[in-house]
């Protein structure tokens, strides 16, 4: 494991360990992934993975299908997940979707998607949430290693704007 990988792992684990008990995690069951940053739940609710953005399927963006596939692998249909609300951030987006971090076991799916290069951090209106440091460390490593969209696409990204991708 490289020094950068070890640092990212340490930051992620430290953040997770320090927040898990007070996070108020709520169980939910996944029905399907709508795209690379949205899940439909058995309760009928829809979750927008907060603080991340994945390429848009409907806009034909580069890596959109693979981002969806990454989320489907991390949180497949029928999987029990834990949802975490960040009190620093809005509860719902303008479409009425829950804004949540999604956890599967000891994995923060939001951070994992960024680490894999399937999504980028997205700090709406510049507001950084509970896992901002982990998300920024994950994107730095994904970019450096050309993981996911960083190796496959031309990526236009700024931390407080949605990601835009196109083929190389």
Model-based region annotation:
Residues 2-168:
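Small beta-barrel nucleic-acid-binding modules, primarily SNase/OB-fold domains
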């Amino acid at each position: 494991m490289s020094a950068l990988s070890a640092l990212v792992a340490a930051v992620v684990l430290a953040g997770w360990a320090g927040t898990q008990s007070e996070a108020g995690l709520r169980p939910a069951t996944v029905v399907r992934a709508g795209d690379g940053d949205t899940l439909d739940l058995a309760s009928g609710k829809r979750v927008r993975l907060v603080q991340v953005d994945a390429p848009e399927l409907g806009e034909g963006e580069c890596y959109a299908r693979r981002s969806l596939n990454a989320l489907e692998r991390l949180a497949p249909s029928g999987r029990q997940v834990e949802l975490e609300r960040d009190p620093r951030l809005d509860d719902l987006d303008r479409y009425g979707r829950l804004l949540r971090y999604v956890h599967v076991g000891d994995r923060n799916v939001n951070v994992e998607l960024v680490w894999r290069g399937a999504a980028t951090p997205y700090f709406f209106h510049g507001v950084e949430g509970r896992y901002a440091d982990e998300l920024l460390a994950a994107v730095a490593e994904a970019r450096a290693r050309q993981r996911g969209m960083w190796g496959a696409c031309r990526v236009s990204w700024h931390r407080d704007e949605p990601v835009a991708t196109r083929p190389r």
